[in-house]
C-alpha cells in the first residue's frame, strides 16, 4: 500500500531531491541537456513534491505568468511510480493549493504530446498548434475548472 504525501518544497534538501528527479526523468530518460532542464527560472517558481513514505517520487514547479495565470512545469514522476496516479495526485494538489489562495487563478502548461491524454483526464484542454520544445512535440493546455 502506498502512502503518497503532497508537500511544497521548503528546504535545500527538498530542492535537491526535486532536481535529482528532474535529472533522472528529463536528462537521463529523455536525453534533455542539463543546461536546458535547469533554465535559471527555478528561483522564480514554487516547487512541489510527492513523497511515498520518506522518499520523494515526483516533483513539479509552478511559475507565475500573469497576475492570475500560473504555469505548471517540469512535472516528473520516477519511472517505477508511473501509472499509480502519482502524477494526477501531484497536479490536483497543486491546483487545490493555489485555488485555496486565490479562487480566480488559472493554470496553463505545455504538455508533451505523448502524454496530453493524461492532462486531459484531469480537466486540461489543448489549444493552439503543436510545437517543439527541446526537440520534443508539445501542445499548450489550460485547466478547466469544474463546478463543485
Task: Please identify what each model-predicted range represents.
Residues 49, 55-64, 68-76:
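Conserved beta-strand in the GNAT
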Residues 120-129:
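Conserved acetyl-CoA-binding loop of GNAT-fold acetyltransferases
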Residues 91, 98-111:
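Conserved GNAT acetyl-CoA-binding A-motif
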Residues 1-12, 147-148:
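Conserved N-terminal entry element of GNAT/NAT acetyltransferase domains
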Residues 34-60:
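Conserved beta-hairpin
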Residues 64-72, 82, 101-105, 133-138:
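A conserved beta-turn-beta hairpin within the catalytic core of GNAT-like acetyltransferases
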Residues 112-113, 132-148:
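C-terminal "cap" of GNAT-fold acetyltransferases
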Residues 77, 83-96:
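Conserved acetyl-CoA-binding loop-helix of GNAT-fold acetyltransferases
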